[in-house]
Amino acid sequence: MSRRKFIRGSAILGASVAMPSLLTAQSGMYSSKENRKIHKILDAEREMVGTLPIMRAFAGDHLDHVSPFVLFDEFGPVDIKAGADALRVNAHPHAGVTPTTYFLSGSGHHKDSLNYDFQVQTGEYMMFSSGRGAIHMEESGQKLKDEGGRIHGFQIWLNTPAAYKLDDPTTTVFRDSHMPTIVNKHYTGRVVLGELDGYKSTIKTFTPAFYYYLKLNKQARLNIPTNPDHNAFMYCVSGSVEIEEQNKLKPNQIVLYKRGQGNINLYSEAGAEVFLLGGQPLNEPVFSYGPFVMNTEKQIMQCINDYNSGKMGDPNKVNQ
């Protein structure tokens, strides 16, 4: 099935809970029974969302290996001239899922039917917990419109467990103080979710998850322990990373790991940027239709009816 479309239904396996820490390997790449094995390496696909170019790594597929996440998009990098029209995704609904946005450079403007209106800056993290349903609009930030510059970031969706899918929606922007930065001789990292090497994010999620942005220095050798019952995947932004079984991860590629072992072993000769994510898979069925991610087809139909009847808000008002 194409990664351009969400699947209509898929079971996800369950798992237990643990927080990882980091160890530094004493040599280069090596194999070990304790290292996670590779399930698959995928090339992200180029698409357009509104007027924004993206690279899509997955969208509703491979859930047995990426849950609790359901979508991974890299947007940009795109250089914007001062005074140019904003890169924009017009008002659209969500339900049963938490779209999150993180900017490596530039800024974004989020406006929604909950009366939130945010400018999200570089290094900040936004969570749009859509719950039973809400509408939002996204575009490049005001500073980029006024001064020009580069926009580059990631929109990654977290699936919402069944117990919380019909909660009231809410939007939150998290500043630097919520996400610790790690600086050492091997890498510079941001702990957006979860815990790494004793540094812990204060951001709460419905189910245990980790989300690390890592800038690897030259000849960085890392062995990152994770819960062997949790999913894990890694996306390469720039540079290249040597991983298990003599494979090399290149820009716009994502590696999905198997469960059963905990350690993620990697090495970068010339340096690299990667996102490493994962967490406890949900033991629940998934029915999805575009921006709606629910547990039954009946719930999907209710989402469509709620949107069409205006219960999620007025898209014309959000677009203003």
Please state what every model-predicted region is.
Residues 1, 21-42, 320:
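C-terminal segment of N-terminal export signals and the immediately downstream linker at the start
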Residues 5-26:
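N-terminal export signals
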Residues 45-101, 182-223:
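A short glycine-rich, His/Asp/Glu-containing loop-to-beta-strand
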Residues 77-144, 148:
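Extended, compositionally biased flexible segments
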Residues 114-129, 243-264:
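Short acidic-glycine-tyrosine-enriched beta hairpin
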Residues 252, 273, 277-320:
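C-terminal flanking tails of non-heme Fe-dependent oxygenases
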